[in-house]
Structure formats: C-alpha cells, structure tokens
Amino acid sequence: MGAEWELGAEAGGSLLLCAALLAAGCALGLRLGRGQGAADRGALIWLCYDALVHFALEGPFVYLSLVGNVANSDGLIASLWKEYGKADARWVYFDPTIVSVEILTVALDGSLALFLIYAIVKEKYYRHFLQITLCVCELYGCWMTFLPEWLTRSPNLNTSNWLYCWLYLFFFNGVWVLIPGLLLWQSWLELKKMHQKETSSVKKFQ
C-alpha cells in the first residue's frame, strides 16, 4: 500500500476526537429532541455538533493563533490542527483571513447555534430567523475560507493525498455547506407554509 493511503497515529487521534464530538452532539441532540419530528431532531443533532466544534475546536484555534501559532503549540487541540494543517497550511501558521473568519465563526456562529437550539426546543416564533441567519453565516465562512485561496491558485492546499483532499478538505468542509443548505431549504418550506396558511385564513374572512 502506498504512503498516500497510510493512516498515521496523528490522523487517527484527530479523527477519534472528531468522532467523539459527533457522538456527543448526537446524544445531546436526541435528548433535546424528544417529542420533536425527525427533521427537527436531525437539526438539533447537527446544531449540538456544530456548537461543540465551534467552541471546543475552533475556539482554542483562535486563542492559539492570537497568542502565537499552532505550529509552535502543544496539546491535543494543537495536534488536531497540525494534522489538518497538512491539508491546508494556513491553519498552522498565522493567516489573517483564516483567523478573522474563525473569530466571527466562534463568536457569532457558535452563539447562534445555541440560541437556535433553544428556539427549536421551546418552539419560539423567531426560530427560522435564527436558522436562516446561522446558515448564511456558515456558508459565508466557507466562502471566505476557500475563495481567496482558490483565487491565488491554492498554494497552501495539499491535494496529493487522498486523506487530505477528500476527507479533510472536501468532506469536513462540504458538510458545512450541505447541511446549512438543507436547513435553509427547510426554513424556506416552513415560511412558505406559514404564508399560505395566513393567506387562506385571510381569504376566509373576506
């Protein structure tokens, strides 16, 4: 088996940490989603995982980047970002665009995810306003993470290895495009349904 197909200890540890956060997100989402429909249970699982990633992984990344950089840091979280940095070197050495986007992501997106969890569980009227806002912010974060790099012919991206290209870059980032897109579609359908219901009610009294 070629070297590009080998899964090292660093990669295994990082993937186990991500899997642990996913398991925690699933457990929290299912617990909070008791009595909810399947779509909302799925949304809660995603939002719990989303919040955990923003606060437990990206929050420490921002701190490490502001006091120094990931390359010169030690610890479990630093090791995870060093591993991801093999696919995208901007996460290892201080990159102003990445750090700026991540500050916004941690502070705004993480907080919005928590507020949205509350809004879904408590069936608040502002649920879809928060959902649309969060999804747009997540998509904007992905856009600003990769478009500047693509415009400069991706000098920091390593696509020569299947793990780095398809798992780290494509899958882990693609999830933050696919699921916010699905949640935007859910909000669109719910707002359309509410508008049709309100319109039909008004017509009955005319």
Curated annotation (Swiss-Prot):
GO CC annotation: endoplasmic reticulum; endoplasmic reticulum membrane
Membrane spanning stretches: 10-30, 42-62, 101-121, 165-185
Key word Repeat present: no
Pfam families membership: EBP
Domain of life: Eukaryota
Keywords, comma-separated and alphabetical: Endoplasmic reticulum, Membrane, Transmembrane, Transmembrane helix
Residue span, EXPERA domain: 39-184
Membrane topology: Multi-pass membrane protein
Tissue specificity field: Widely expressed with highest levels in liver, lung and kidney.
MF terms in GO: cholestenol delta-isomerase activity
One GO term of the biological process aspect: sterol metabolic process
InterPro entries for the chain: EBP (IPR007905), EXPERA (IPR033118)
Compartments, record wording: Endoplasmic reticulum membrane
Physiological role: Does not possess sterol isomerase activity and does not bind sigma ligands.
Classification via PANTHER family: EMOPAMIL-BINDING PROTEIN-LIKE (PTHR14207:SF4), STEROL ISOMERASE (PTHR14207)
Assigned protein family: Belongs to the EBP family.
Quaternary context: Homodimer.
Name by which UniProt lists this protein: Emopamil-binding protein-like
